[in-house]
Amino acid sequence: MLSKEAMKAKKKYSKLGSIISWLVVHPKKIKMWKVKLQRLNFNLIGKINPKSDGASKEELTLGGIRTWKITTPNSDPEKILLYYHGGAYQVGSPEGYYPMLTHLARETGFTIYIPDYRLAPEHYYPAQVEDGVKTFEALINELGYSPGQIAFGGDSAGGNMSLVTLLKLKDKGKSLPSAVFCISPWADPAATGESYNDEMCSKDLLLGPIF
């Protein structure tokens, strides 16, 4: 029979072993842990950054996709902006973008919808664009807005999503939004444009398009 000291030591090292086992993950899972940490950090932005006074949010479902509706006292219920968030199609969420979009709603007078579209690596492209199309069409078919009332756009990957969603709608002969905008769009994911190399070699690195 083990002594009290031995039992205590066994219990202590058993806990340590459990912690070590939890930390050691398969190489294929390491990237996923990194992505989850990035998502957590992104969402913290929504809790830290200041929001516009009087802003409010409502969670609903559009085309089966969790979506936030963001308004301020300046928001016109007849002027709709569908915002696709950035994040390299891997991170980003309504939670993380909420502060920024409250200010955008205040300054533009739009009522903003931001979908929590599917992300990689759990969902391969073009799942993201499919969600972009679904949310736009749901604004029309489920909430009764006319295409002329709706503009959509986004930043980075959201800018790419805006352009591709527009092309998908056009190719299918679907209704189009009244306007589309892109903020620093990730328009060349494969980095095939000459400007990437030319800018990086001939100018200050921080002025190149990669930044």
Describe every region a protein language model picked out.
Residues 11, 58-211:
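Alpha/beta-hydrolase superfamily serine-hydrolase fold, recognizing
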Residues 1-73:
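A glycine/proline-hinged amphipathic helix-loop "lid/cap" segment
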